[in-house]
Amino acid sequence: MSSFLYTVTSFFILDSSKGERVIAKYYNNDFDTLQKQKAFEKKVFDKTSKVNFGGEITLLDNYLVVYKSFSNIIIYMVGDQNQNEIALLYVLNSFIDTLQNLFENSQINKKLILDGINYTLLTLDEIIDGGIIMESDSAVIADRVGIKAPDNDDLDESINKAVTSVKEQLFNFLK
């Protein structure tokens, strides 16, 4: 059964200038200490930060690494070398699409990620549970996270209902 499951061993976001950790989640025991995690992140950063053509997929120490670079961060998703690289890249893109949807198409950057850390982590948790990829549809994920502001039409309708209710209560009180 496990051959039908897509899994992730780790997910992290690094500062693109220094390779410092912004966010990291590890899902297996290969990197059970902070020292091992940071050493792996450094190796990944050293390999991927030198790529000038914007590569999105690489192999490192029996791990498949997919990543996307932005203005001041790099977002990484790591699976074992037997995972489907297209599936991992699709899930990474779904994570990014969800964030762009939730943050109203704002440019993804370190400040946005840190200012919206709760939403960023909740989005990640909706996609990955214990290392198993549970969802990859960005619209479904954004709906589950549910932080979008209401549309103006919905807000107007809510205000109109409240005003009508107050009028009715006032009218009944004055009778």
UniProtKB/Swiss-Prot annotation:
InterPro entries: AP_mu_sigma_su, Coatomer_zeta, Longin-like_dom_sf. The keyword Protein transport applies. It is found in: Cytoplasm; Golgi apparatus membrane; Cytoplasmic vesicle, COPI-coated vesicle membrane. It holds the Pfam family Clat_adaptor_s. The keyword Acetylation does not apply. One of its GO terms (biological process) is intracellular protein transport. Keywords: Cytoplasm, Cytoplasmic vesicle, ER-Golgi transport, Golgi apparatus, Membrane, Protein transport, Transport. GO terms for cellular component: COPI vesicle coat; Golgi membrane. It is a peripheral membrane protein. Belongs to the adaptor complexes small subunit family. The coatomer is a cytosolic protein complex that binds to dilysine motifs and reversibly associates with Golgi non-clathrin-coated vesicles, which further mediate biosynthetic protein transport from the ER, via the Golgi up to the trans Golgi network. Coatomer complex is required for budding from Golgi membranes, and is essential for the retrograde Golgi-to-ER transport of dilysine-tagged proteins. The zeta subunit may be involved in regulating the coat assembly and, hence, the rate of biosynthetic protein transport due to its association-dissociation properties with the coatomer complex. Oligomeric complex that consists of at least the alpha, beta, beta', gamma, delta, epsilon and zeta subunits. This is Probable coatomer subunit zeta-A. It comes from Dictyostelium discoideum.
